[in-house]
Amino acid sequence: MASAKEISQYLKRFSQLDAKRFAVVKVGGAVLRDDVDALTSSLSFLQEVGLTPIVLHGAGPQLDEELTAVGIQKKTVNGFRVTLPETMAIVRKVFHATNLQLIEALQRNGARATSITGGVFEAHYLDQETYGLVGGISAVNIAPIEASLRAASIPVIASLGETPSGQILNINADVAANELVHVLQPYKIIFLTGTGGLLDADGKIINSINLSTEYEQLIQQPWVYGGMKLKIEQIKHLLDRLPLESSVSITRPADLAKELFTHKGSGTLIRRGERVIRATTWKDLDLPRLQHLIQSSFRRTLIPHYFETTPLLRAYVSENYRAAVILTKLGNVPYLDKFAVLDDAQGEGLGRAVWSIMREETPQLFWRSRHNNQANAFYYAESDGYYKQDHWKIFWNGLHHFQQIQQCVAHCTQHPPTLID
């Protein structure tokens, strides 16, 4: 799946969190119906490595089927399922049955799991005249969740609420997930879907979204509309209320471990992200912080007087100095002198966000990389071509004439290293 180093890095990061801050996993009824084996396998794996996710589920398709069987037609208003008193008994039965099916499937996989079908969401009528027995959430009681976590058992929570007087109310699973996340402030929020992520105009999964730099442009794309637009807006609202390090992952059940434990991931990773600083002179940057970023990323030391002797063309630096691109000029084409990302920012999509901003205004570019650089796979994907030498791989973008490429290769060959082993 990934290198042992990558897996160990993420496992260490997750293990240092308070148990209830690791992850909330929201599972739709369709996943429970169509992909329960992959779901339980992935959740069981997390428990095996010492992590306990908090699972919240819906039961939409199961409820549709049960209501149809008794001749009751589904009715929704503003995205909420109208729940009449005569259907509440069916709603409750379906949620309890769905919850127990997941519990039993987890137990067959050797996992410990706790059924929680009440006592978490204190609710009020959202609008009884319009929606019937549909609730909004007044308060979240995490005591049942904490008890389950103390026993190293996966809490499996149904999206049902109760009023202070004891009336059970149907709660939209997305609403329940949002309120639960707001209280728990988890590091990861995971939405498991059949599509495995958000899809772009070509139907391909978007790897990562850095909301600070990409949201406004993304939301204006013609292919972002309807349910997808609403989902992105909801996720932005959700992350705006969480710590900066929190993120949302949208993936398939079978790919959950890959999404959590590898830099590349498998699905769509969405973070609030960081603003990117653009500078054309060194004096506009915090050079000690930039030096720390570069040296930590490469695990090498910059040559003395690097900033004094290196003519800066442009620098793109994340506001917390966790990722940076430094461009200089060798000849007539911008030269990528440094692309640095801190270890704790690996897999966030932050490096890609900084890279994308740089590429938008740098149509021509060349750079070199050592043969053992872990970023080479990314460079192969991002470059138009490359040339292999004894000590370097030389990459370029936007260069179409052989003589120009030859000059860039010569510059890379002659340019002395700026990092000391």
Curated annotation (Swiss-Prot):
Species the sequence originates in: Xylella fastidiosa (strain Temecula1 / ATCC 700964)
Q: Name one GO biological process term.
A: L-arginine biosynthetic process
Q: Which PANTHER family match?
A: N-ACETYLGLUTAMATE SYNTHASE (PTHR23342), N-ACETYLGLUTAMATE SYNTHASE, MITOCHONDRIAL (PTHR23342:SF0)
Q: What class of enzyme is it?
A: transferase
Alphabetical list of Pfam families matching this protein: AA_kinase (PF00696), NAT (PF04768)
Q: For this UniProt record, give its keywords in alphabetical order, as a comma-separated list.
A: Amino-acid biosynthesis, Arginine biosynthesis, ATP-binding, Cytoplasm, Kinase, Nucleotide-binding, Transferase
Domain N-acetyltransferase intervals: 274-420
Source organism, top-level taxon: Bacteria
User: For binding substrate, which residues are annotated in this chain's numbering?
Assistant: A59, G60, R81, N170
Q: Which GO terms describe its cellular component?
A: cytoplasm
Enzyme Commission code: 2.7.2.8
Q: Does the keyword Ligase apply?
A: no
Q: According to its UniProt record, where is this protein located?
A: Cytoplasm
Q: Name one GO molecular function term.
A: L-glutamate N-acetyltransferase activity
Q: What is the organism lineage in this UniProt record?
A: Bacteria, Pseudomonadati, Pseudomonadota, Gammaproteobacteria, Lysobacterales
Name this protein carries in UniProt: Acetylglutamate kinase
**UniProt site positions, description: Transition state stabilizer:** K26, K231
